[in-house]
């Protein structure tokens, strides 16, 4: 996969993209990273990339010329996913990360200021994505967050494919509780089932815990999840247990 970032602050990406999984993905030729400062593509002597909005209003708007010019230097095809980070976009999700992990080429347009000239949005962009109902100073941090979520799903990046298959959201539920050594710590013990060696019982316990954890923390996900009759019985027993205290 190749990822290009159009940004006014390419140095922001160094710390995140040159360590841990991102670094290994590049070393193993699973990922190619390129940052482009679109200020270099400004058309006046002051390298101006923003201007006042037509019709008045607060803040500055990113001009179309630098972004369009920068895009012309990228090897963009009809299959390239050009992503605009903006609050009005589709909320980012694990499902979106899975979809994007199958792309060969992604371009992130990371803006600043009040917004983008609408012609950037309508003529260059394939996907508008939001990280949530809040506003950040720029698109760099969301782009890096998305990159981490996407790249770890590329086959061969994590080494153990089961690693991301057990993650929260991979099957629509939150992840089950995890434990490691020591068996007892400050009077807190690991559930016996995890030490039993009975993998069928362990899998059943983990699924039950995923259902209960999701029910408690993300009931919206439970509403979307295709509960089996057994799942419904698990949750019903849990609710009865809560009432009994």
UniProtKB/Swiss-Prot annotation:
Disulfide bonds: none annotated. GO terms for molecular function: tRNA (guanine(37)-N1)-methyltransferase activity. It is found in: Cytoplasm. It comes from the Bacteria. Signal peptide: none annotated. It is an enzyme of class 2 (transferase). S-adenosyl-L-methionine binds at residues 111, 131-136. InterPro entries: Alpha/beta_knot_MTases, tRNA_m1G_MeTrfase_C_sf, tRNA_m1G_MeTrfase_TrmD, tRNA_m1G_MTases_N, tRNA_MeTrfase_TRMD/TRM10. GO terms for biological process: tRNA N1-guanine methylation. Keywords: Cytoplasm, Methyltransferase, S-adenosyl-L-methionine, Transferase, tRNA processing. Its EC number is 2.1.1.228. GO terms for cellular component: cytosol. Its main location: cytoplasm. It catalyses: guanosine(37) in tRNA + S-adenosyl-L-methionine = N(1)-methylguanosine(37) in tRNA + S-adenosyl-L-homocysteine + H(+). It holds the Pfam family tRNA_m1G_MT. NCBIfam families: PRK00026.1 (NF000648), trmD (TIGR00088). Homodimer. Specifically methylates guanosine-37 in various tRNAs. Belongs to the RNA methyltransferase TrmD family. This is tRNA (guanine-N(1)-)-methyltransferase. It comes from Staphylococcus aureus (strain JH9). The gene is trmD.
């Amino acid at each position: 996969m190749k990822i290009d970032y159009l940004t006014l602050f390419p140095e922001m990406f160094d710390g995140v993209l040159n360590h841990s999984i991102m670094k290994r993905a590049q070393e193993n030729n699973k990922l190619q990273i390129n940052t482009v400062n679109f200020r270099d593509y400004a058309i006046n002597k002051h390298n101006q990339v923003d201007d006042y909005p037509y019709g008045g209003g607060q803040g500055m708007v990113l001009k179309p010329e630098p972004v369009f010019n920068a895009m012309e230097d990228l090897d963009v095809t009809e299959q390239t996913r050009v992503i605009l980070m903006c609050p009005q976009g589709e909320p980012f999700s694990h499902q979106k990360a899975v979809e994007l992990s199958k792309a060969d080429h992604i371009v992130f347009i990371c803006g600043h200021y009040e917004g983008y000239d609408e012609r950037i949005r309508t003529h260059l962009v394939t996907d508008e994505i939001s990280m949530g109902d809040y506003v950040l100073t720029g698109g760099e941090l969301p782009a890096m967050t998305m990159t981490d979520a996407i790249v770890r799903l590329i086959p061969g990046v994590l080494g153990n494919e089961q690693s991301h298959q057990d993650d929260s959201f991979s099957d629509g539920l939150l992840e089950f509780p995890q434990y490691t050594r020591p068996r007892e710590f400050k009077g807190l013990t690991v559930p016996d089932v995890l030490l039993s060696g009975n993998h069928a019982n362990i899998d059943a316990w983990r699924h039950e815990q995923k259902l209960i954890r999701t029910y408690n923390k993300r009931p919206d996900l439970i509403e979307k999840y295709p509960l089996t009759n057994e799942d419904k019985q698990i949750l019903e027993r849990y609710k009865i247990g809560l009432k009994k205290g």
